[in-house]
């Protein structure tokens, strides 16, 4: 994979450190821009990388925010391997404990699911920013996968749930935002594009309804990823923080 030229400046401006995370056997790449202001953690989405946040990170760091961004296992410049939601959740929790406390966490797509699960398990932030949240319930994902093979969706999704629980010690359904989002009281900004073809805007609308302290901002014409490099979105995020 060749990094887009627009993201090259991100790698020039950040301090880079590979760490051996206790929550995983993999080496994890962290990116830092130290500053005297509030500490902010960035968590990208599935098939993403930290450099996708370059626009928001540049604006925040130029305004004194202290930046940490993480390439998740199997992504970016971290160890190339498979990963899963429980592992990513544990990693976010670990970084929060070892490198925090963080004033805010900014997440894209699937990264928001991991971040909210970390909050469920005890991580604390003053501000949450969810950009293009991508998953609300877990089981429909399993059923969609099974359906691709023409199999009985309900039966085989249940079998996959059983297998995952035996491997990870928790039912995949427990990680679904439908199970706990109404218990999260952290002040949250949700930003979503109405024409996002990868994550339906209804996910953002539902989270806004579920959660107790949210601001919902809907955009147009920015899709699922271009939203991360939009200047107005970056300014919106900074003003919220």
Language-model features and meaning:
Residues 50, 57-79:
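Conserved alpha/beta-hydrolase
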Residues 56, 177, 186, 200-209:
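Short alpha-helix in the alpha/beta-hydrolase fold that links the catalytic acid
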């Amino acid at each position: 994979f060749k990094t887009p030229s627009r993201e090259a400046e991100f790698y020039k401006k950040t301090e880079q450190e590979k760490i051996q995370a206790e929550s995983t056997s993999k080496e994890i790449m962290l990116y830092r821009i130290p500053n005297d202001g509030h500490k902010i953690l960035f968590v990208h989405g599935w098939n993403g990388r930290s450099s996708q946040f370059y626009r928001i990170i540049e604006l925040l760091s130029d305004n004194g925010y202290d930046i940490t961004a993480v390439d998740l296992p199997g992504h970016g410049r971290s160890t190339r391997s498979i990963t899963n939601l429980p592992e990513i959740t544990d990693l976010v929790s670990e970084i929060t404990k070892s490198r925090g406390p963080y004033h805010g966490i900014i997440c894209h797509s699937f990264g928001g699911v991991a971040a909210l699960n970390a909050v469920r398990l005890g991580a604390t932030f003053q501000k949450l920013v969810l950009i293009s949240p991508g998953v609300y319930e877990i089981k429909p994902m399993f059923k969609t996968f099974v359906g691709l093979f023409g199999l009985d969706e309900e039966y085989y999704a249940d079998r996959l749930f059983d297998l995952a629980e035996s491997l990870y010690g928790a039912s995949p359904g427990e990680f679904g935002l439908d199970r706990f989002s109404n218990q999260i009281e952290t002040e949250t900004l949700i930003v979503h594009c109405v024409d996002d073809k990868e994550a339906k805007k209804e996910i953002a609308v539902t989270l806004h309804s579920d959660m107790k302290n949210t601001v919902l901002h809907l955009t147009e014409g920015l899709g699922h990823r271009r939203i991360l490099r939009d200047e107005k979105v970056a300014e919106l995020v900074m003003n919220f923080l």
